[in-house]
């Protein structure tokens, strides 16, 4: 069964997800960094799959306007060696694309 993931006005359908934690749901594509900086922390999105794999998104350092998004795909709880990892500044269109790539790696 697919689970629905709402991001920046778009909807992605995630198959084989055990659960989805989505703290990005209230951010819209036209929001600026200063509009949402109080929402940006290390725990923004986590998709846990039935096979134990994880897609994880956070903002580092939390609540810091000079920070960056980090997107990772993790297998077998090996956080030290992600199968995919990307960092990027505040660009929500690019973030959506990076999340799609991370999902495709699982």
Feature locations, PLM:
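Functionally constrained cores in energy, signaling, and assembly domains
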Residues: 9, 73, 106
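Negatively charged, low-complexity tracts enriched in Asp/Glu with abundant Ser/Thr
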Residues: 1-51, 80
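Polybasic, proline/glycine-rich intrinsically disordered low-complexity segments
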Residues: 80-106
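Short linear sequence elements within intrinsically disordered, low-complexity coil regions
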Residues: 18, 24-26, 65, 74, ...
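Generic structural hydrophobic/aromatic packing signal, biased to beta-strands
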Residues: 14, 47, 71-73, 99
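Intrinsically disordered, low-complexity regulatory segments enriched in Ser/Thr/Pro
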Residues: 55-90
């Amino acid at each position: 069964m697919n689970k629905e993931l709402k991001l920046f006005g778009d909807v992605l359908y995630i198959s084989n997800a055990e659960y989805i934690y989505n703290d990005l749901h209230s951010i819209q594509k036209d929001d600026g960094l200063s509009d949402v900086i109080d929402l940006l922390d290390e725990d923004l999105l986590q998709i846990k799959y039935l096979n134990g794999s994880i897609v994880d998104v956070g903002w580092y350092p939390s609540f810091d306007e000079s920070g960056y998004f980090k997107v990772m795909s993790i297998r077998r709880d090996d956080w030290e060696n992600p199968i995919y990892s990307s960092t990027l500044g505040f660009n929500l269109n690019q973030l959506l694309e990076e999340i799609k790539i991370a999902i495709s790696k699982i």
